[in-house]
Amino acid sequence: MKNLLICIIKMYRKYISSLKRPSCRFYPTCSQYSIEAIEKYGALKGTLISIKRILKCHPFNEGGYDPVK
């Protein structure tokens, strides 16, 4: 399951995200953060952590450096 989620994120980065201008307010980007979270915490907890991060990525949040903890 973990590898499937990471593959989906990589496909998103290659085929969808590459067509848009960069818009993530954080470093690492939300997709890279998601991969790192899934690798570190597993499919379920990593996905939940990723969703929390993605919900913070909007114009009213300053963004900045936010590594997987």
Swiss-Prot record:
Its main location: membrane. The keyword Membrane applies. InterPro entries: Membr_insert_effic_factor_YidD. One of its GO terms (cellular component) is plasma membrane. Pfam families: YidD. Keywords: Cell membrane, Membrane. Coiled coil: none annotated. It is found in: Cell membrane. It is a peripheral membrane protein. Could be involved in insertion of integral membrane proteins into the membrane. NCBIfam families: membrane protein insertion efficiency factor YidD. Belongs to the UPF0161 family. This is Putative membrane protein insertion efficiency factor.
